[in-house]
């Protein structure tokens, strides 16, 4: 059964220069002047994720993430490995980087043989994941269009890597997908909504805690009232400052010692004039009440796919029918639930309750699943650091998914059962191979050629790649090579046997 999903409707051209997203109160029908409507209260403002000129691709700005995470003492770093830790001159010589960038100097040159090709990586990401985020444009009448961000839509694939999205047939969002308007973008691999929420919180600092201009057509009278209140508040503080100065003329020493702590002095600061304390407190509450994204758990790569979406009949696609049949045969719980529903329907028919029969039929109609095929036009491979690689669609269709990638989560789960032992082993691996003293480490992906490790050291988050000695041919072989890297055998000198 396909669960209903939430679609976020976003107005085109409605954006701010200070934040990626903003929460705004849902407008009432009496307010008027609003050129958009949406299914949730989140407005998409594509300032940090935007289209590349001439390509229409969704561009991911890594500088934005890096700059913002410096303020959180946890930033993302570039994936370019430009120096080697094995060079004694570079180890002992004067550092060419800022202390917060020292990780970059200790990373080795990246070996291309230790990674899957872009086409193989793309095909693997498509096969391993089963949900994607749709971005499409719909019309709301009178020539006004809206952007729709629709997360977590389940899909299945065929033998060529094509995507078939499963949507409830009564979803109103898909009514905007027509033969003339079926151009969409799909994001696969990243937890899109969580990352957008995090970027929204980080974007608050861009405004320097100033209120933004209301672009949705609301009345500016409230803003004017707030400005007047702020002016009165500052004027009162200045009056108190003057009174304090008159009262303390006889004691200049006390004035000097208390001037930094007096109310009037700190009220004259520029930050206090540009930000009302109530506004500051409100923003602090918003930041503190939201759980931040744990960037240590984010995958090493994701996809931005550009293509055309079209409705299909499953009967015309044998591959899809076979996959659906296999899925149904392995889901015993769903079968039992369907049998129970059938029995309940039979009982209701025997009782002659016409209303219950009609309601059950309506429920079945609402749960009818429609399939939409994505005809891929362009594909972009995006790393967690923001590096982007365009991959040919034909190469992706010819490539085969990695044989070990499907078992990656299970291998990681078994390794993490060791608890602190595996954590210390991963930290030791970073130190032995890259001379990096990691504070936090986490396995984020495994394939037949090696594994990706996410580490936090100081104010930076970095991803490292460790290659296997030989290509893994099975799940057990891959896990064995990982354990061999984490727990190397030490060569101990043989003790002579006593005579």
Swiss-Prot record:
Bias type Polar residues, positions: 489-499
Annotated InterPro entries: Haem_oxidase_HugZ-like_sf
Ranges annotated as biased composition (Basic and acidic residues): 87-104
Keywords: Phosphoprotein
Residue positions, PTM Phosphoserine: 355
Region described as Disordered: spans on this chain: 76-118, 208-268, 478-499
Biased composition, class Acidic residues, residue ranges: 208-263
Name of the featured protein: Uncharacterized protein At3g49140
């Amino acid at each position: 059964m396909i669960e209903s999903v939430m679609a976020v409707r976003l107005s085109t051209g409605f954006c701010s220069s200070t934040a990626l997203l903003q929460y705004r109160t849902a407008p009432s029908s009496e307010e008027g002047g609003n050129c958009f409507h949406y299914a949730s209260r989140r407005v998409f403002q594509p300032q940090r994720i935007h289209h590349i000129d001439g390509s229409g691709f969704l561009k991911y700005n890594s500088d934005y993430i890096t700059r913002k995470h410096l303020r959180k003492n946890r930033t993302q770093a570039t994936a370019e490995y430009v120096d080697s830790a094995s060079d004694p001159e570079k180890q002992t010589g004067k550092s060419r980087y800022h202390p917060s960038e020292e990780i970059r100097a200790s990373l080795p040159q990246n070996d291309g043989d230790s990674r899957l090709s872009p086409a193989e990586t793309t095909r693997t990401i498509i096969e391993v994941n089963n949900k994607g985020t749709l971005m499409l444009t719909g019309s709301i009448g009178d020539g006004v269009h809206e952007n729709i961000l629709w997360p977590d839509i389940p899909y299945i694939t065929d033998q060529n890597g094509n995507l078939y999205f499963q949507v409830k047939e009564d979803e109103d969002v898909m009514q905007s997908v027509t033969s003339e308007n079926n151009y969409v973008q799909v994001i696969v691999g990243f937890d899109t909504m969580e990352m957008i929420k995090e970027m929204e919180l980080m974007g608050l600092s861009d405004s320097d805690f100033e209120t933004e201009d209301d672009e949705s057509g609301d009345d500016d009278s409230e803003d004017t009232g707030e400005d007047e209140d702020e002016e009165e508040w500052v004027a009162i503080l200045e009056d108190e400052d003057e009174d304090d100065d008159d009262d303390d003329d006889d004691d200049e020493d006390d004035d000097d010692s208390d001037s930094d702590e007096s109310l009037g002095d700190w009220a004259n600061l520029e930050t206090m004039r540009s930000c009302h304390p109530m506004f500051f407190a409100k923003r602090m509450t918003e930041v503190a009440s939201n759980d931040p994204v744990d960037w240590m758990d984010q995958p090493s790569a994701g996809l931005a796919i550009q293509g055309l979406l079209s409705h299909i009949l499953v009967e015309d696609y044998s591959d899809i029918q076979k996959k659906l049949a296999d899925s149904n045969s392995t889901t015993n719980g769903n079968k039992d639930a369907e049998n129970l529903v059938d029995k309940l329907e039979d009982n209701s028919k025997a009782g002659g309750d016409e209303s219950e029969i009609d309601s059950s039929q309506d429920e079945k109609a609402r749960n009818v699943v429609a399939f939409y095929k994505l005809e891929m036009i362009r594909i972009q491979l995006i790393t967690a650091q923001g590096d982007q690689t365009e991959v040919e669609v034909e190469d992706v269709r010819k490539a085969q998914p990695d044989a070990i990638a499907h078992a990656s989560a299970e291998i990681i789960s078994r390794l993490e059962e060791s608890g602190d032992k595996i954590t210390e082993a991963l930290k030791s691996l970073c130190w032995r191979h890259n001379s990096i003293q990691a504070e936090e480490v986490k396995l984020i992906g495994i394939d037949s050629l090696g594994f990706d490790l996410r580490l936090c050291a100081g104010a930076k988050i970095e991803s490292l790649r460790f290659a296997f000695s030989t290509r893994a041919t099975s799940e057990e072989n891959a896990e064995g090579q990982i354990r061999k890297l984490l727990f190397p055998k030490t060569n101990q000198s043989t003790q002579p046997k006593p005579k």
